A protein has these predicted regions:
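Active-site proximal loops enriched in glycine and acidic residues that flank catalytic Cys/His/Asp
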Residues: 25-27, 36, 64, 69-70, ...
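Generic secondary-structure signature for well-ordered alpha-helical cores
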Residues: 28, 55-58, 98
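A conserved acidic, glycine/proline-rich C-terminal tail/linker
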Residues: 48-87
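Glycine-enriched loop-and-adjacent helix/strand subsegments that border the catalytic/binding cleft
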Residues: 1-50, 120-131
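Extended hydrophobic-aromatic, low-complexity segments
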Residues: 32-35, 58, 104-106
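Charged, cofactor-coupling segments
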Residues: 2-3, 8, 76-132
Length: 132
């Protein structure tokens, strides 16, 4: 599901820049990868990314979402030497930060997983109703 953090008087750009995100991949085969990403290490700052995405050249009257990505790219071999890393079905992937919480997903085939019917309208309706 989505992970959204809105800026307000308790959380601003400097807070976002100082975040460290932990990533963990755990497999049924005993595989465990961990990594830490420092948002401050991104190659382009938030203001630079926003200025490239918004202006007369790209107009979004209703706003937009800025996805900054992650610095984590596993290079360890998983199944055989020289083949690199690939997810297996059942892998549990978690991205977490003490301030933001955690996003946890299990790798599966889309056609075999429950339908993702919780969309943006329901999310914002729940936010408006004070549900979490």
């Amino acid at each position: 599901g989505p992970l959204i953090r809105l800026f307000d008087e308790t959380f601003g750009l400097e807070d976002a820049r100082s975040l460290e995100l932990r990533l963990t991949v755990t497999g049924d085969d005993g595989c465990k990868l961990t990594g830490v990403n420092s948002v401050g290490s991104l190659s382009r700052g938030f203001e630079d990314l926003v200025s490239a995405a918004h202006g007369r050249h790209h107009q979004y009257p209703d706003g937009f979402v800025l996805f900054t990505g992650t610095l984590f790219a596993p290079t360890e071999d998983r199944d055989a030497a020289g083949l690199g890393f690939t997810h297996h079905l059942g892998d549990v992937v978690m991205i977490a930060n003490d301030h933001l919480g955690a996003l946890r997903n299990t790798v599966g085939r889309s056609e075999d997983l429950p339908a993702w019917d919780y969309g943006i309208r329901t999310l914002f309706a729940d936010i408006g109703a004070g549900q979490r």
